Amino acid sequence: LSSVWGQQALRAQLSYRPDGSIVLQDAAFTVNTQLFKAFFPLYLGGALSGEFAQIAINEGHVTNAEGVVRLRRGVWTARSGNIPLGDYQIDFSSADSAAVGTVGALKTITGSLELSGNLSSTLTDYQIAVEATGPVARDESFRQAMSIIAIPNQDGFSVSLTGQY
């Protein structure tokens, strides 16, 4: 599978397992985050890319992912002007020995918004826990914009989301 549309690109080997799951192997993608604005009120700029040895999808849920997602030149595109955030990476791996579920470790490569945290998903639920520190995390307008999902603290804010599919 290979597709290029503008600055966006997707490449992967696609297979279908007898249990109904779809598997992408040797997968890579590049997406400009501006594309997301067509679907979500996401005020984030930058280049999103990923490389995966494998991604397994069953009944619409990612059941296994081995790879990395990177956000380069991340920018909060605020009405008052763009706020540079930085470069980030999420390393994904299998959640357990049965390879059912995925965990991700978020880290900051460089930037004025320092993010660290974990993500996990199974067939039925997900959990996201992120800590944000640094100068941008203490910026009042940015904190206000994040207040829908974030809990302020002395150093910045925390995001803790859990849910079921």
Enumerate the predicted regions with their spans.
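Short, hydrophobic/aromatic-rich segments at coil-to-beta transitions
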Residues: L1-S2, S21-Q25, V68, S97-A105
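N-terminal beta-strand/beta-hairpin edge segment
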Residues: L1-Y43, A47-I55
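Residues on the solvent-exposed faces and adjacent turns
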Residues: D26, R73, T108
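Transmembrane beta-barrel outer-membrane domains
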Residues: P41-Y43, I83, T110
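Short helix-loop boundary/capping segments
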Residues: V62-T102
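Extended terminal
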Residues: L85-Y165
